[in-house]
Amino acid sequence: MAEPFNECNLGAHATPDFIHYNRLKAWKAQDSSFPFINAHDTTYNVRDNSNWEYTLKPRLRARLRNSKNIILILSENTKESRALREEIKYGIGELGLPVIVVYPDLSNSQIGNGNSPGYMAKKYWDKLPSLKKLIESVPSVHVPLSKDKITQALNDNDFTIQHKISNYCWRYHD
């Protein structure tokens, strides 16, 4: 994602990671039992050219305060924009929100084996220095972009702020 949004007419929604995010929204629209709750719906929408300090950053923080966890899409196209860096630093670093990391480009075996992240997953963390620094401070589950795997992770109370388990819990669902 560009700083903070893509400049084309479609804005952020044209970036590859937002296409994956829109897939989550489509799954929810097609299946009401899909447990995805879109935090962006908890505050009013803002324009891509809104002021960062007075509009975008406060909306992002309000959304995070209303969240039980963070779903982070981490792909070969992910870039650490100002907005993503703020989401990670505030959501993980200050609020302690558990993270569900979704890897659209990786299989279960590339993501990790049981309680240890795999080489490829760790390589993707290099794209987000703020995540790499903070990921061990909260519970996290790592899954491929699969409706079943994401459903499993979202339904797991261990990865919600209300019931979170110990920090640095590397596990994903087979």
Model segments located where?
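Conserved N-terminal substructure of TIR/SEFIR domains
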Residues: 1-66, 159-174
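Conserved beta-strand termini and adjacent loop/short-helix elements that scaffold enzyme active sites
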Residues: 37-39, 102, 144
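Glycine-rich, charge-decorated loop segments at or immediately adjacent to ligand/cofactor-binding or catalytic sites
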Residues: 105-130
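Short, glycine/charged-enriched secondary-structure capping and boundary segments
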Residues: 24-26, 85-88, 114-117
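A conserved mid-domain beta-alpha-beta active-site/ligand-binding segment of alpha/beta enzyme cores
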Residues: 123-174
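Noncatalytic linker/hinge segments flanking ATPase motor cores
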Residues: 48-54, 76-79, 110-119, 140-149
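Internal hydrophobic scaffold segments of catalytic domains
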Residues: 10-16, 20, 24, 95-98, ...
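Conserved beta-strand-loop-alpha-helix hinge of the TIR/SEFIR fold
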Residues: 63-92, 97-108
